[in-house]
């Protein structure tokens, strides 16, 4: 009886140890490339603002990050089917997504912007100006929703898997204008080697129905404890200056 009890206790301890070891690694899903937020270096290493901030958050919590590359179209279904534990991939917090996932506190709030070739005669993204034009957006993003609702009846809204694919079509004159998160458009268009692009119109953050409340980390709705650990770690990184260091590396000025 004692041997049986000891074996049972040993088995339980081993199972507990296995569960604890699994809990020490959090799998974070990311869709690449979306420079400067998430992309690969020539070496194949993942980097970007989300990647570095995510690694810093995991270090603060005391766990390891395992990054899982996942296409945007399937990124929420993959979370719900437990392919990974959370999504940290420039995902905008909005009411529609809140019905499916639990968001962390916002960690970044970028504006959106319209980008055209420097030689373009488009001066404003007014609806009448874009009538008959081809608009590029990344499929399934807030920019996709906004452009479809606001311009879909007068313009050809073309959807792409990545921002890089949009750039290729822009360079080949298959697009007249693209609508992106400003940091991504700045990195892929304004700061590119060609650099023959410009922004038309101002920075866009409204209406909240489309542009939400900033970027958040998405969790399964029942994973409140895990979300709180990331919220606490984010607050600590903002207090101790780590967040500002990462922000300045990618965006060049201190987050206010």
PLM feature spans:
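Short helices/loops that flank or line small-molecule/ion binding pockets
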Residues: 56-60, 68-69, 73-85, 100-102, ...
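Sec/Tat signal peptide C-region and signal peptidase I cleavage site
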Residues: 15-21
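Periplasmic-binding protein-like
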Residues: 32, 109-116, 193-231, 251-256
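A ligand-binding cleft/hinge motif common to bilobed small-molecule-binding domains
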Residues: 74-77, 89-99, 146-149, 176-211
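Bilobed "Venus flytrap"/periplasmic-binding protein-like clamshell domains
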Residues: 32-35, 46-59, 113-163, 182-184
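Ligand-binding clefts/hinges and TM-proximal coupling segments of bilobed small-molecule sensing domains
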Residues: 64, 142-158, 197-199, 229-256
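Extracytoplasmic small-molecule ligand-binding "clamshell" domains
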Residues: 22-90, 99, 240
């Amino acid at each position: 009886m004692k041997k049986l009890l000891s074996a049972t206790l040993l088995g339980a301890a081993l199972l507990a140890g296995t569960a604890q070891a699994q809990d020490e690694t959090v799998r974070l899903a990311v869709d690449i490339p979306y420079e400067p937020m998430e992309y690969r270096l020539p070496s194949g290493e993942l980097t970007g603002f989300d990647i570095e901030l995510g690694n810093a958050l995991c270090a603060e919590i005391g766990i390891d990050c395992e990054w899982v590359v996942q296409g945007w179209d399937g990124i929420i279904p993959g979370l719900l089917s437990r392919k990974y534990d959370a999504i940290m991939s420039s995902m905008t917090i909005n009411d529609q997504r809140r019905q499916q996932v639990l968001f962390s506190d916002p960690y970044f709030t970028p504006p959106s912007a319209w980008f055209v070739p420097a030689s373009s005669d488009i001066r404003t993204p007014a609806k009448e100006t874009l009538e008959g034009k081809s608009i590029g957006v990344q499929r399934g993003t807030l920019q996709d929703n906004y452009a479809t609702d606001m311009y879909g009846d007068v313009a050809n809204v073309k959807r792409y898997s990545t921002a890089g694919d949009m750039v290729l079509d822009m360079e080949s004159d298959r697009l007249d204008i693209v609508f992106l998160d400003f940091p991504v458009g700045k990195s892929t268009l304004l700061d590119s080697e060609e650099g023959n692009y410009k922004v038309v119109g101002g920075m866009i953050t409204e209406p909240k129905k489309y542009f939400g409340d900033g970027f958040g980390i998405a969790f399964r709705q029942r994973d409140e404890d895990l979300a709180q650990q990331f919220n606490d770690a984010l607050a600590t990184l903002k207090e101790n200056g780590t967040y500002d260091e990462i922000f300045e590396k990618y965006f060049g000025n201190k987050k206010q």
